[in-house]
Amino acid sequence: MAKKVKAIVKLQIPAGKANPAPPIGPALGQHGINIMGFCKEYNERTASMVGTIVPAEITIYDDRSFTFITKTPPAADLLKKAAGVTSGSGTPSKSVVAVISKGQLREIASVKMKDLNAVDIEGAERIIEGTARSMGIKVE
């Protein structure tokens, strides 16, 4: 028989830098799971991606055990890294903070493909292009 799911917690944590301090401690502690166990396992899985934010979806069961999956970094972070900016535009419809190429867009879309609700790479590119537009990043 399958375990009964108690909660699903979604967190965005810097890769390789999970520790029991907030926001991880309070989010997981209220469900009674071993926070250090999660932090060690997360840091091992994300050791190769240090410097990026890696979302984790933690499934907590009634017997206080847990499983988690790591996702790809947020599209906004990948776009900021590709464009070489620290933040998006405050007024994206009026001012452009950076320009990225179609090649960079395709590369980001291929990385994000497994987490996006897109059938093909062109659909994924359109989703990422919309995110770029809302950040004030122009695609040429």
Swiss-Prot record:
UniProt KW keywords: Methylation, Ribonucleoprotein, Ribosomal protein, RNA-binding, rRNA-binding
Modifications after synthesis and translation: One or more lysine residues are methylated.
Pfam families noted in UniProt: Ribosomal_L11, Ribosomal_L11_N
GO biological process: translation
GO CC term, one of those recorded: cytosolic large ribosomal subunit
Disulfide bond residue pairs: none
Record keyword Transferase present: no
Gene Ontology molecular function terms on file: large ribosomal subunit rRNA binding; structural constituent of ribosome
Role this protein plays: Forms part of the ribosomal stalk which helps the ribosome interact with GTP-bound translation factors.
Family to which this protein belongs: Belongs to the universal ribosomal protein uL11 family.
SUBUNIT field: Part of the ribosomal stalk of the 50S ribosomal subunit. Interacts with L10 and the large rRNA to form the base of the stalk. L10 forms an elongated spine to which L12 dimers bind in a sequential fashion forming a multimeric L10(L12)X complex.
Protein name: Large ribosomal subunit protein uL11
Gene name as annotated: rplK
